[in-house]
C-alpha cells in the first residue's frame, strides 16, 4: 500500500500529465527509470523533448524543494534518456518543473516553470 506521500505524488503526476496534454504536449513516458534515478514525465512539445519534474506539496512552495544537487541529477538523467533512446546530439530538449499545491486531497494550484533547470 502506498504511503500518503507517495499517493500525493501520484495524484500530482497525474494532474501534471493531464495539464500538459491540455496545453498540447504529448506524454511519451511516465516514471522513466535508469540506474541513476527517475524522470517523472517525458513529453514532447513540437520538436522538443521536455523532461518534467513534478513536485506536489501541502505545506511549502514546491519549487523550494529543487536543490542544486537535484538539478544536477535531472540534467544527468536527461542525458541518460537521450542516450538510452539513441536520440541524436542535435535533439532539442529542456527540463521543466511543475509545482503543485494540494489541499484536502485536491490540486489547488499549478506553477509550470519552463526550462527551469539548465546545464549551468
UniProtKB/Swiss-Prot annotation:
One of its GO terms (molecular function) is nucleic acid binding. This is UPF0102 protein Caur_2698. InterPro entries: Restrct_endonuc-II-like, tRNA_endonuc-like_dom_sf, UPF0102_YraN-like. Belongs to the UPF0102 family. The lineage of its organism: Bacteria, Bacillati, Chloroflexota, Chloroflexia, Chloroflexales.
